[in-house]
Amino acid sequence: AVQKVDGEPRAHLGALLARYIQQARKAPSGRMSVIKNLQNLDPSHRISDRDYMGWMDF
């Protein structure tokens, strides 16, 4: 019974995490936020991200 109680919340969280990742990949806003995070972490990524955003506009 203890294993069943511990297993259910983990499976539920795993399902929510997988669902969140799928939505982040599909949603343009999710990609935009990833690009902004890369710009904040490393200035050298700004040029490549700017070209990628320009490519997304088409």
Curated annotation (Swiss-Prot):
InterPro entries with a match to the protein in the record: CCK-like, Gastrin/CCK, Gastrin/cholecystokinin_CS
One example GO MF annotation: neuropeptide hormone activity
Domain of life from the UniProt record: Eukaryota
Residues annotated with Sulfotyrosine modification: Y52
Keywords attached to this entry: Amidation, Cleavage on pair of basic residues, Hormone, Secreted, Sulfation
Residue numbers of Phenylalanine amide PTMs: F58
An individual GO BP term: digestion
A single cellular component GO annotation: extracellular space
Matches recorded under Pfam families: Gastrin
PTM notes: The precursor is cleaved by proteases to produce a number of active cholecystokinins.
Cellular compartment(s): Secreted
Assembly and oligomerization: Binds to CCK-A receptors in the pancreas and CCK-B receptors in the brain. cholecystokinin 8 binds CCK-A receptors more potently than cholecystokinin 58, cholecystokinin 8 and cholecystokinin 58 bind CCK-B receptors with equal affinity.
Described function: This peptide hormone induces gall bladder contraction and the release of pancreatic enzymes in the gut. Its function in the brain is not clear. Binding to CCK-A receptors stimulates amylase release from the pancreas, binding to CCK-B receptors stimulates gastric acid secretion. cholecystokinin 58 and cholecystokinin 8, but not cholecystokinin 58 desnonopeptide, stimulate amylase release from the pancreas. cholecystokinin 58, but not cholecystokinin 8, increases bile-pancreatic volume.
Similarity comment: family membership: Belongs to the gastrin/cholecystokinin family.
Protein name: Cholecystokinins
Gene label: CCK
